[in-house]
Design a protein with these regions (language model features):
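N-terminal helix-turn-helix DNA-binding core of bacterial DNA-binding proteins
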Residues: 27, 31-70, 92, 96-104
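N-terminal leader segment of winged-helix/HTH proteins
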Residues: 1-40, 84, 106-107, 111-112
Length: 113
C-alpha cells in the first residue's frame, strides 16, 4: 500500500512563532514550548530525535540498537516526543515509522534566536 504525501506549506517562523527575545510569550505558547524543551531534556529522547532527523523517516525497530534500549523503553520515549509534538508516527504493520514534525525543530531554534 503506497502512502500519499502532501506538500507542507512553508511559512516564515516570524509569522507563527516570535522569538522569546522579540516579544513576551503568551501562556499557551510558553506551555507548548516548555513541553517540547522538557521532552528534549532527556538524553535518550534527544538521541532518538537526532536519529530520526538524520534518517528522515525511521522504523521504531531500527532505533533499539543505536540507543541500546529495549523496545518498551524506546516506545516510551518516542511517545513522549510525539506528545510534545516533536515527531509524528505512522503505524505500518507491527511497527511505527517516525519522522520529525515539520515545524517543531525549526520553532525551537527560531524561538531562541
Amino acid at each position: 500500500m503506497a502512502s500519499t504525501r502532501k506538500p507542507v506549506a512553508v511559512i516564515e517562523a516570524a509569522d507563527c512563532c516570535p522569538s522569546v527575545l522579540a516579544a513576551p510569550l503568551d501562556e499557551a505558547d510558553a506551555e507548548r514550548l516548555a513541553r517540547r524543551f522538557a521532552a528534549l531534556a532527556d538524553p535518550i529522547r534527544l538521541r532518538l530525535l537526532s536519529l530520526i532527523a538524520a534518517a528522515d523517516e525511521v522504523c521504531a525497530c531500527d532505533l533499539l540498537e543505536p540507543v541500546d534500549r529495549s523496545q518498551p523503553t524506546v516506545s516510551h520515549h518516542t511517545k513522549q516526543l510525539a506528545e510534545a509534538g516533536l515527531i509524528v508516527g505512522e503505524k505500518r504493520g507491527r511497527w511505527t515509522w517516525w519522522r520529525v514534525a515539520p515545524d517543531a525543530v525549526a520553532e525551537l531554534r527560531d524561538v531562541l534566536t
